[in-house]
Amino acid sequence: MTTSFYFLLVALGLLLYVCQSSFGNQHTRNSDTPWNRCGSQITDSYRELCPHKRNDAGKKRGQASPLWQRGGSLSMLKARAKRNEAFHLQRAHRGVVEHCCKRACSNAEFMQFCG
């Protein structure tokens, strides 16, 4: 009786181990696995995957630009070029949303938007 009891315990232990290891891998994500990133997940991924880039746009809002403080020495073409740069930055942000939120993207694909 004791031998069959120990055999049953070992069998149950092995079964538990197999179940735990197979279900435990369901929730882990490989870095190359594409997944959808939306909202704050895009920001978190940007901070994690693009550490060499900083986005200071939010800090500069409300402050006068040093270029505008020069007393009108900029031509209209330079001012328009500056506006166009900001427009392209906004479009690049929409590109990351289009590519990684509405469709899934991997870390390697996301890093193409680091710039």
Swiss-Prot record:
GO terms for cellular component: extracellular region. Disulfide bonds join C38-C101, C50-C114, C100-C105. Residues 1-21 form the signal peptide. Gene3D superfamilies: Insulin-like (1.10.100.10). The modification 4-carboxyglutamate is found at E48, E98, E109. One of its GO terms (biological process) is glucose metabolic process. Pfam families: Insulin (PF00049). The keyword Chloroplast does not apply. GO terms for molecular function: hormone activity; toxin activity. The keyword Disulfide bond applies. Its main location: secreted. InterPro entries: Insulin-like, Insulin-like_sf, Insulin_CS. It is found in: Secreted. Keywords: Amidation, Carbohydrate metabolism, Cleavage on pair of basic residues, Disulfide bond, Gamma-carboxyglutamic acid, Glucose metabolism, Hormone, Hydroxylation, Secreted, Signal, Toxin. SMART domains: IlGF. Residues 22-29, 53-94 form a propeptide. It comes from the Eukaryota. The modification Cysteine amide is found at C114. Transmembrane segments: none annotated. Heterodimer of A and B chains; disulfide-linked. Belongs to the insulin family. This venom insulin facilitates prey capture by rapidly inducing hypoglycemic shock. It is one of the smallest known insulin found in nature and lacks the C-terminal segment of the B chain that, in human insulin, mediates engagement of the insulin receptor (INSR) and assembly of the hormone's hexameric storage form. Despite lacking this segment, it both binds and activates human insulin receptor (long isoform (HIR-B)) with a high potency (EC(50)=15.5 nM). In vivo, intraperitoneal injection of this peptide into zebrafish lowers blood glucose with a lower potency than human insulin. This is Con-Ins T2. It comes from Conus tulipa (Fish-hunting cone snail). The lineage of its organism: Eukaryota, Metazoa, Spiralia, Lophotrochozoa, Mollusca.
